[in-house]
Amino acid sequence: AISDIGTCEADPEASYFANVQIPMYLANACKDNNRKLICFSSDQVYSACEDDGSYTEENVKPGNIYAAHKLEMEKRVLDILPSAVMLRAEWMYDYYEKRSNYLMMILNAIHTQDSVSFCSKQFRGITYLKEVAENMDKVILLPGGAYNFGSETTQSIYEVTNKFLDMLGKKLIVKDALARHNLWMDCSKVRKYGVEFSSVIDGLERCARDYKL
């Protein structure tokens, strides 16, 4: 997949091949060989919803090419293979230095004492990658369809960031960014099948404890 929104906007053809056509090839292969298919979709399918959320699986409105391609991928794959599972994943993080994610952004900013910017009005989930891995045995057993998948929150990403810094005992300037659309998912559908995540702030606390941050 190509998950960078800017890259997809700049090259829609490459985005379509990576984010729609390749999953369709996989769906056909799984159909021919009687295999289960799990695809990662994205919370970006809610990026232009008119209400504030939290969003259930039926309430979709993509606001960029990446999101539109992910939603089309879901529909096309499920047409080919109704048993396939589409996981609408959030921004995932872990202690991994080779690729930027929320955790590494905060830790790097603490190290350099650069400021970070998050919107006090934006509600979105972020998910500890370890909890994603821990849930995969249950994901394999899910009925076909689309599922919101990740940690839930009752706080803005700005509030979460300040609480996380307090938890770490670190000082950092957190600027209030311009308003951004919520990516705030209701994950109750998947929870009915035993797929459980910590809340956003509890997931960050667990990650900090795991890595002794």
Where are these regions (language model features)?
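NAD(P)H-binding glycine-rich loop region in Rossmannoid oxidoreductase-like domains
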Residues: 1-18, 31
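Residue-level signal for the nucleotide or nucleotide-sugar donor/cofactor binding architecture
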Residues: 10, 18, 64, 124-127, ...
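Catalytic helix-loop patch of NAD(P)-dependent Rossmann-fold dehydrogenases
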Residues: 10-13, 17, 21-25, 45-87, ...
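A short helix->loop->beta-strand "cap" motif at the edges of active sites that frequently abuts
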Residues: 32-36
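The catalytic Tyr-centered alpha-helix of NAD(P)H-dependent dehydrogenases
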Residues: 62-69, 99, 121, 128
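NAD(P)-dependent short-chain dehydrogenase/reductase
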Residues: 75-124, 131
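Mid/C-terminal beta-alpha module of Rossmann-like enzyme folds, strongest
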Residues: 133-182, 186-187
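C-terminal amphipathic/interface module of NAD(P)-dependent oxidoreductases
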Residues: 171-173, 177-213
